[in-house]
């Protein structure tokens, strides 16, 4: 009988410790959820319906890229050579851009980083896009509110003539021209 009492007391103690630890974990998870909610408050890029900001720059080949000169739908891609997901997404972006209805002139790819590090990306993208290399606070990233890489957006002119985002996260497996 004393052995049974000891076992029941031990199981009861273990259950109590488990309950206290579980409640502690739940409390910490709530704190982390609140912290993550505050950090994730800002969007990572312009959202659908938002106007593309002004940009006036040139591609690596010297082609002028000015928001007011954009005439049709444009696919924007943003990549960083230091970003592993960017390396994974780059071949799919290149393949998707190859089938854009407007061809190379309807695709603008921005590589964020120094020119030497960006050279490999520029080489792959130049066939299918007008490529810009800029710093993290560059004109293209600012115009589209980019805060994360990789980012792929599509913009078109609205009825009032403004260039607005129509797809804030282009699915590269979808045929070109289809929006969300």
Where are these regions (language model features)?
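Long, leucine- and charge-enriched amphipathic alpha-helices
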Residues: 1-47
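Short active-site neighborhood of thiol/selenol oxidoreductases, capturing the structured segment around
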Residues: 66-93, 110
